[in-house]
Every structure is written in structure tokens, then in C-alpha cells.
């Protein structure tokens, strides 16, 4: 009888351990994914002979899901020209493939080139549109609607504080907005229209952007134009233009 009790107790302990282990097992679809990009560069100024090395980016991101319809992302740059910057920190509700809602800190939906991560950029430096005009990250909420059949499209729009990433305690009488529409009428072609209103100080700034690109074989052809105007004609209008042609040379895996 005593031996039977011991065996029953042992079996209960093993069953409890197996149950606990099963409870601690994280389903594959909920396992977080870690991504990273390290980009170093060397620059030499031919006019005065000055030169320097630089770690332009050292980005690390963590993203995943906590529920089938709830996703998250956190991204930090440990060396943005020597400075540490928190880039993305948001949660996203995606009930289906048609629409989603995002809340947190993110890149504002605007332009084509500004949305490229460092590992997706075609050149050592970003374009003027991506770096000086359309490079905006802010805290707010966005909604996105997409269609994959008929006329494929993606429409994104959002409201943002307008005070950047560090002044999140400020209260605002008005919010910034940004809207971006992507049309994909045929395969490998994209037409993007976007507009944005920001209020950096006491003057509202309005920006309008149109861009398109087409990919075929090894080629990527892209053109983008941005118009920036200030309320009450406070400053001169700004015109920004970006165009390039890229040809990919594929190499065998392992080389």
C-alpha cells in the first residue's frame, strides 16, 4: 500500500511538471523576433582633405504578438551618429487582413523614401526628402485600410502630438495629421500620394508628396516630388525632388 502511494504521488508530480511545462511553452506564433542593423561608414572631403569614420546606425528591434490580433514592436538605435534614440514603441490591433489600428511611437505615414530602414536604403546617405523634409517620427494613433483584389491599395492616416519623441508630457490645442495612399494597379508598380500637416512652433507647415516606382527584372526606377509650404507665407516654399535608377547584381548564396 505504501509503495502504491509513493507511485501515485510520483505520477502526480510528473503529471504536474508536464502540465507546468506545457503551460510555459510559448506557441511559435507568439515567439518574439529580434532584428538588427549595423551600418558603419568612412567619409572623406575632397575639398579640404578632412576624413572620419562613423557608426551611422546600430539598430535593434523586437516584435511579436501577444494575441492573434494584437502585435507589438520596440526599436532602438544604439548609435545614431553616436546618440542613443528610441525609435518605435507601439501596439497594433489587426482584426483581419483589411484594416488595423496602431497606437504609440512610430514613423509618420508620409513619402516613399523616408519609410525605408537603413538596410533598405539604396545609397550611403538618404535622399533630401527622407532626411531633411519627410523624416518625422512622433507619438500618436493611426488607422490603415488595405485591399488586395480589384485595385490593390493601402490607405493610412493618423493624428500625432507634433512635439517629437521626447516632449510627450505637453498638452496640445491642435494635433498634427498625416495621410498616405498607395495604389498598386499592376504588379511591381506603386503610386504613392501623401500629405502632412505639422506645427513645430507657431507656424503650421503643410507638405504634399507624390512618388512612384516600378520594378522589373533587376531594375528599380523611382521618382518622388515633395512640396512644402508655410501658413501665412512665413517662409519661402520648398520643392524637393528625388529620382534614381537601380540595377541589382545578384550573387550566389554563400559567396
Language-model-detected regions and their locations in the chain:
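A short hydrophobic/aromatic micro-motif that marks alpha-helical segments and, especially, helix-coil
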Residues: 19-20, 83, 165, 201, ...
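Single-residue recognition of alpha-helix boundary sites
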Residues: 15-16, 115, 228
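Outer membrane beta-barrel
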Residues: 24-164, 173-175, 181-190, 244-246
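Compositionally biased regions
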Residues: 11, 17, 22, 179, ...
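Detector for outer-membrane/organellar transmembrane beta-barrel domains
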Residues: 27, 172, 182-255
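Cleavable N-terminal export/targeting peptides
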Residues: 1-27
